[in-house]
From Swiss-Prot:
Belongs to the peptidase M24B family. GO terms for cellular component: cytoplasm. This is Probable Xaa-Pro aminopeptidase P. Mn(2+) 1 binds at residues 425, 523, 537. InterPro entries: Creatin/AminoP/Spt16_N (IPR029149), Creatinase/aminopeptidase-like (IPR036005), Creatinase_N (IPR000587), Pept_M24 (IPR000994), Pept_M24B (IPR033740), Peptidase_M24_C (IPR032416), Peptidase_M24B_aminopep-P_CS (IPR001131), X-Pro_aminopeptidase_P (IPR050422). Mn(2+) 2 binds at residues 414, 425, 537.
Length: 617
C-alpha cells in the first residue's frame, strides 16, 4: 500500500492543538488497554500517518511530523509515509528516540499533549521527565484529538458477543484462577487488582470474544479483591449462558463505569489512610505496569497504587497440561493444512503454470485451514510474500497492489490460526525453481539458528535475552543479522503475541526467566532489502530435561517443538550442516510424516509432496 495524503488531516489536527494550547501531540499505536493488535476504531496512529504496521508512535508539532517504528517495519514505513512525515528508525545510531525528538520539539516551554488512556503511568512519568529537561511539559488531553479529526468516518466500537471457553481446553476453572490470584494479592498485602489487559481478562474468566481482529478478546475491565470479583463489560455482550456461568460469584457492571468506581476506591483508600503521609501496602491497589495513565490517575496515582508485572500475565504464560495438549494437537492439524497448501501451490505454479498473486495464495490457505477441527479464524494477517516482498518483515499483501507469485523466486509464508484448543504461528520459506547459492546459504544459516534454539539446554533462571544469541551466532559469523526478535510468547486460543517471555534483546526478556510450560516461537531470519527474505518459524514448549551432571542441583530446561510442517529441502545446503544438525532435520521430518501423513490417505498430490519433502538429507 502506497502513501496516503495526510495534509488535510494534519492541518485539522494542528487547528485542534492550537485551540487547546498544545504545541506537540503524541499519537501512540495502542488502545486504552495497551493492546498490540487493536480494533479498527482505535487505529488512530494509522489514520493520522498512513502507516499500517502494528508498532510505532506518531508525533506531530505545529511544523513537523515524525513516525517512530522498529526494524520490522522500516521498509514498510518508508513506502507508506508521505512527504509530511520523517521516519525515526528505532535503535539506529545517531537517530533520536521518539521521546528525545518530542523533547526537542518542546524546547522553550512548549506543551506536549497525549491522551492519558493510551500510555502507561510509567511511560507518562518517564516522558514527563525527558520533556521537562528541555523546558517543556507533558499534559494529559482527555478528549482524543485524532477522534475529532476522524469524525463520523471513525469505525464504531465493536460489541460482539462473548463466548465460554470450555474447561476441556482451558484446563482450569475461573474460580480456581481467581482463588490463585487472591493468594498473590494476599502475599502482596494488597486491597485488590485492577485488570485492564484484554487477554488477561479473557484468560481469567475463561471467556473469549471477537472485538479485535485475530485476537479472541473483548472490551472489558475487572477488579478482583479478597472478597469480590467485578467484571466491567457492556451488558449486551453477555449471552444468557455466560451470565448464568458467572453466577453470583462475579458482579457484572457497565464497561464505562470503571473510572467512576476506581475513583470511589481511591477515595475510600484515602479515608482509610486517616491523614497518614502514605497509604499502607494493605490499602493499595495493584495495577499492571501496562495499565493506562488515566486508570492510575483515577485510582489516586502512586499514593494508592502499586504498579507490578501482572501476576495474571505470569500465570497465563505457564500453560497447564490441557493447554499444552491442545497446542500439540492444533499444530498437527495446522501443519497438515500448510502441507496441503504448499503442495497445491507448487502444483499450480510449476505444473499448471497458473498465474496466482500473493492474496490468491493467502486466501487458499485460509480456505484449507477452515476445514480443520476447532478452527475459529486466523491469528494474524497472513504474510504471503514473493521475491523482494519477502524482505519486508511484516509485509501485508493487498489484492489491488500485490505481486504475482514468482516460481523462480523465494516465497515466504508466515501464517497462523486460532483453534479452540490453541493458537498457531508458523513461517516457511520455499523455492519452486532453482535458488541461488546465496539464498541456500542464508536459508541454511537461519535453519542452523533455529536448531540451536530448539536443541538448547540451559539452567533454570535463564532468560530469553540470554538465549537470543544462540539463534544469531551462525549469521554473525558471516557478518549477517536480522532486525527483529527471535521469538515471542504464544497464547492458548488467545493472542499470538503474548508476554512476558520471549527470545530477544527487549528489556522485558531479560527480566523473566524461561519456565516449563512456556510456549514460544523460534523464528530467526535474514533479509536482503529489495532481493529476498528468509524466515523459518517453529513453536516450541519449554520443559525440564535430564542432563549428565545437573550442576548446581537445580532443574535444567530444554524445548519440545510442536510445529509439524516440512522444511524446504531445495533451500538446504547440507554441506553447511554438522552431522548433528543433519540428524535433527531428518528426525524432524520423520516426525512430521508420522504425525500428518494420515491426513492425506485420499490426497495423492499432497501425500507425494510430503513424502518428497520429508526424505532424509
Amino acid at each position: 500500500m502506497g502513501p496516503v495524503d495526510t495534509s488535510q488531516r494534519l492541518a485539522r489536527l494542528r487547528e485542534l492543538m492550537q485551540e487547546r494550547k498544545v504545541d506537540v501531540y503524541i499519537v501512540p499505536s495502542e488502545d486504552s488497554h495497551q493492546s498490540e493488535y487493536i480494533a479498527p476504531c482505535d487505529g488512530r496512529r494509522e489514520f493520522i500517518s498512513g502507516f499500517t504496521g502494528s508498532a510505532g508512535c506518531a508525533i506531530v508539532s505545529m511544523s513537523k511530523a515524525a513516525l517512530s517504528t522498529d526494524g520490522r517495519y522500516f521498509n514498510q514505513a518508508a513506502k507508506q509515509l508521505d512527504n509530511n512525515w520523517m521516519l525515526l528508525k528505532r535503535g539506529f545510531e545517531n537517530m533520536p528516540t521518539w521521546q528525545e525528538w518530542t523533547a526537542e520539539q518542546a524546547e522553550g516551554g512548549k506543551v506536549v499533549g497525549v491522551d492519558p488512556s493510551l500510555i502507561t503511568a510509567s511511560e507518562a512519568r518517564s516522558l514527563s521527565e525527558t520533556i521537562e529537561k528541555s523546558g517543556g511539559s507533558l499534559q494529559g488531553v482527555q478528549e482524543n484529538l485524532i477522534d475529532l479529526v476522524w469524525g463520523k468516518k471513525r469505525p464504531a466500537r465493536p460489541s460482539e458477543k462473548v463466548a465460554l471457553h470450555p474447561i476441556e481446553f482451558a484446563g482450569k476453572s475461573f474460580e480456581e484462577k481467581i482463588s490463585d490470584l487472591r493468594k498473590e494479592l494476599q502475599k502482596k498485602k494488597s486491597a485488590g487488582f485492577v485488570i485492564s489487559m484484554l487477554d488477561e481478562i479473557a484468560w481469567l474468566f475463561n471467556l473469549r470474544g471477537n472485538d479485535i481482529p485475530y485476537n479472541p478478546v473483548f472490551f472489558a475491565y475487572a477488579i478482583i479483591t479478597p472478597t469480590t470479583a467485578d467484571l466491567y463489560i457492556d451488558d449486551e455482550k453477555l449471552p444468557a449462558e455466560v451470565k448464568k456461568y458467572l453466577g453470583d460469584q462475579v458482579s457484572v457492571k457497565p464497561y464505562g463505569s470503571i473510572f467512576e468506581d476506581a475513583k470511589a476506591l481511591s477515595q475510600s483508600a484515602q479515608k482509610k489512610s486517616d491523614g497518614d503521609a502514605s497509604t499502607s501496602p494493605s490499602e493499595k491497589f495493584l495495577i499492571s505496569t501496562k495499565a493506562s495513565w488515566s486508570l492510575s490517575l483515577a485510582l489516586g496515582g502512586e499514593k494508592n497504587v502499586e504498579e507490578v508485572r501482572s501476576p495474571i500475565t505470569d500465570a497465563k504464560a505457564i500453560k497447564n497440561e490441557a493447554e499444552l495438549e491442545g497446542m500439540r494437537a492444533c499444530h498437527i492439524r495446522d501443519g497438515a493444512a500448510l502441507t496441503e497448501y504448499f503442495a497445491w501451490l507448487e502444483n499450480e505454479l510449476v505444473n499448471k503454470k497458473t498465474v496466482l498473486n500473493e492474496v490468491d495464495g493467502s486466501d487458499k490457505l485460509e480456505q484449507i485451514r477452515s476445514k480443520h477441527k476447532h478452527f475459529v479464524g486466523l491469528s494474524f494477517d497472513t504474510i504471503s510474500s514473493t521475491g523482494p516482498n519477502a524482505a519486508v518483515i511484516h509485509y501485508k499483501a493487498e489484492r489491488d497492489t500485490c505481486s504475482i507469485i514468482d516460481p523462480k523466486a523465494v516465497y515466504l509464508c508466515d501464517s497462523g490460526a486460532q483453534y479452540l484448543d490453541g493458537t498457531t504461528d508458523t513461517t516457511r520459506t520455499l523455492h519452486f525453481g532453482e535458488p541461488t547459492e546465496m539464498e541456500r546459504k542464508a536459508y541454511t544459516l537461519v535453519l542452523k539458528g533455529l536448531i540451536s534454539i530448539d536443541t538448547a539446554v540451559f539452567p533454570k533462571g535463564t532468560t530469553g535475552f540470554a538465549l537470543d544469541a544462540f539463534a544469531r551466532q551462525h549469521l554473525w559469523k558471516e557478518g549477517l543479522d536480522y532486525l527483529h526478535g527471535t521469538g515471542h510468547g504464544v497464547g492458548s486460543y488467545l493472542n499470538v503475541h503474548e508476554g512476558p517471555i520471549g527470545l530477544g534483546t527487549r528489556v522485558q526478556y531479560a527480566e523473566v526467566a524461561i519456565t516449563p510450560g512456556n510456549v514460544i516461537s523460534d523464528e530467526p531470519g535474514f533479509y536482503e532489502d529489495g532481493v529476498f527474505g528468509i524466515r523459518i518459524e517453529n513453536i516450541i514448549i519449554a520443559k525440564e530435561v535430564k542432563t549428565t551432571h545437573g550442576f548446581g542441583e537445580k532443574p535444567w530446561l530444554g524445548f519440545e517443538h510442536v510445529t509439524m510442517t516440512p522444511l524446504c529441502q531445495k533451500l538446504i545446503n547440507p554441506s553447511l550442516l554438522t552431522d548433528g544438525e543433519k540428524k535433527w532435520v531428518n528426525d524432524y521430518h520423520s516426525k512430521v510424516w508420522e504425525k500428518t501423513s494420515s491426513y492425506f490417505e485420499n490426497d495423492e498430490l499432497t501425500r507425494n509432496w510430503l513424502k518428497r519433502e520429508t526424505q532424509p538429507i
